[in-house]
Amino acid sequence: MSKITSSTLRTFKQEGKKFTALTAYDASFAGAFDSEGIDVLLVGDSMGMVLQGHSDTLPVTVEEIAYHTRCVRRGIERALLIADMPFMSYATPEQTMINATTLMQAGANMVKVEGGKWLLESVAMLTERGIPVCAHLGLTPQSVHVFGGFKVQGRDADNAQRILDEAKALEAAGAQLLVVECIPAPLAKAITDALTIPVIGIGAGKDTDGQILVMHDVLGISSGYIPRFSKNYLKQTGEIRAAVRAYIDEVAQGIFPGSEHTFN
């Protein structure tokens, strides 16, 4: 079983092969997702909401992400493992380096940061020092209070152009992957077409190179607000591994996300 790397994902993009990602927080679920063929696993700061019961992701700490990264690492053999850098853990380049090192030493293959042009120096610094970076644009949940809630981004021409420009700048700075969240599908397609690095969408239409969802949404065990872009695969399959396979198959076939999961 060949390990997934950023080079693998670039090859998928070049070949037009859609890939899938899920969040994971422990060895058992991560192992199941890995063995069924999920390509990318994210130890997300979404744990603040789905594991810890907070209303947003802001309370999550580097130590908590590192702990769960170690757990997931022990359970997987194939998938690329990304660790989220939580709120205010990368406010300065120096702080970014210290905390990213902690997460890489915990077993991550890559770290993910939310934000645009203000991150360019940190992205370049990490890349130059051997720490791969996944960037994240659009709805960046750590900025929920700036946005005034979990709202679709990039609907007007100026903001759409800004997001596209930031995507190009982050790639130029060295980012190896990009997540785009809750942006109009045409904008996501424009970004995907403009970049050579793979683009992973969540609530961004079907034209991105890959898709990511929160595992609790895929398994229908999220409490409270259920995002429009999510889909409960356990409901239609009745078994966890079958749910994961259905998600992988629907992404590969271009069935998911459908129009009901997409913003325009």
Curated annotation (Swiss-Prot):
Q: What is this protein called?
A: 3-methyl-2-oxobutanoate hydroxymethyltransferase
* Recorded family membership: Belongs to the PanB family.
Q: Quick one: which pathway? A: Cofactor biosynthesis; (R)-pantothenate biosynthesis; (R)-pantoate from 3-methyl-2-oxobutanoate: step 1/2
Subcellular compartments: Cytoplasm
Q: Name one GO molecular function term.
A: 3-methyl-2-oxobutanoate hydroxymethyltransferase activity
The residue ranges crossing the membrane are none
* Coiled coil (residue ranges): none
Q: Keywords for this entry?
A: Cytoplasm, Magnesium, Metal-binding, Pantothenate biosynthesis, Transferase
Residues that hold 3-methyl-2-oxobutanoate according to the record: D45, S46, D84, K112
The scientific name of the source species is Shewanella pealeana (strain ATCC 700345 / ANG-SQ1)
**Name of the gene:** panB
What is the recorded function of this protein according to its Swiss-Prot or TrEMBL entry? Answer: Catalyzes the reversible reaction in which hydroxymethyl group from 5,10-methylenetetrahydrofolate is transferred onto alpha-ketoisovalerate to form ketopantoate.
Question: Which enzyme class, named as a word?
Answer: transferase
> What assembly does the database describe for this protein?
Homodecamer; pentamer of dimers.
Per its UniProt record, the required cofactor names are: Mg(2+)
